[in-house]
Amino acid sequence: GAAGMMCAIEAGTRYRTVLLIDHSPKIGKKIRISGGGRCNFTNMNTLPEHFLSSNPHFSKSALSQYTPYDFVQLIEKHDIQFHEKAAGQLFCDDSAQQVIDMLIEECEKAKVEFSLANQVNNVEHANANKYEITTDLGDVICDSLVIATGGLSIPKLGATKFADELASKFDINVVSPKPGLVPFVIKDKDLQSLRGISFPAQVSSNNSVFDDS
């Protein structure tokens, strides 16, 4: 996905030898369907205070090191045309495939190698400083390992509990996931005529207020 490819690009740019393994024959499936197929690639209102977290300092650190403006600069470097839909939400004019192609090109520039349609079956410590990865296409020994499998929200795209199981195996603490984007299901028949209609609304909870449509 996007996070794994961005990580691979950064590591390759730092002159690390990088192998990106994905069980799918095509990478970037979630990118392809994001934003209705146009990829809502960033939000200019992405600020630390807009994140709910048990560690609020993490969002401050992460967003100060790589900002939405940095990604927009990358988009413009690849001549991808985009537009602002609402409240700082940026979408490609054409297709989400443009963002996938951009990330693949950046990976290639950073000399990242791809191993696609390759399932990771097991990970063990090869010794105190290395990992041994068992895959369908053979074993890999590496100094560093990043698991970027994403969440469990879209199982049909291949989402599994592999990352959680691996974290548990290596005694890495995992924060229990909570719903971040869920529908409101209303059974009142008198409201069925509103189905499919979007309109501006304001939602408040405690001291937080959200405006959207």
Question: Regions from the language model: what does each represent?
Answer:
Residues I27-I31:
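A short beta-to-alpha transition loop/helix N-cap that caps and shapes the active-site region
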Residues S53-S59, E76-D101, E132, C142-S144, ...:
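Helix-loop-beta segment of a Rossmann-like dinucleotide-binding subdomain
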Residues I9-E10, R32-I33, G158-T160:
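Short amphipathic alpha-helical segments
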Residues G1-L20:
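N-terminal Rossmann-like FAD-binding beta1-loop-alpha1 element of flavoenzymes
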Residues G36-A86:
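Glycine-rich active-site loop/strand segments that organize a redox cofactor
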Residues L52, S64, P68-F71, C92, ...:
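Generic structural signal for well-ordered, non-membrane alpha-helical segments
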Residues G1-A3, K26, G151-S153:
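Residue-level detector of alpha-helix initiation sites
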Residues R14, H23, Q98, M102-S213:
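Predominantly flavin-linked oxidoreductase catalytic cores and closely associated redox partners
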